Amino acid sequence: MVNSTVYEKVTYKQIDDMKHALGFDKRKVRGIKHRRYEPYRNYFNTGERDVDDWEQLVSIGFATKSRENWYHVSDDGKIFLERVTGVSFLPVIQNK
C-alpha cells in the first residue's frame, strides 16, 4: 500500500522517468471520466547517471530492480502515478 508521506520525496524527474518506463503517451490515454492507459512496456535502463534516482524509488517501494541498471515501476509506483496523473495504468500489453 502506498504511504502518502513518501510522496514528497519523489522529484518531477523521477515521475517523468517512471512514466517513460511505462511508455506513457498522453495522446494514447482512453476515456473521459475513467481515464486509462495500457502500457506496452515496464522497464528503464538507467545507464550510470540515473542510478541514484531509481535506487531511491526502489527504497520507497515505487520501483524494483531486475539487474544492473534495469528498473521496473512497481504496483505501488503505478498507484502513485495514478494519483499524480489521474490516469489508471492497466497491465502491460503482452506480445500478441
Regions picked out by a protein language model, each given a short descriptive name:
Residues 58-68:
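A short, conserved structural fragment
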Residues 75-96:
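Short, amphipathic alpha-helical interaction segments positioned at domain boundaries
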Residues 27-28, 63, 90:
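A general structural signal for well-ordered secondary-structure junctions
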Residues 2-51:
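Short amphipathic alpha-helical interface segments
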Residues 69-74:
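Minor-groove-contacting beta-hairpin "wing" of winged helix-turn-helix DNA-binding domains
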Residues 21-25, 61-62, 84:
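Generic structural signal for hydrophobic core residues of well-folded globular domains
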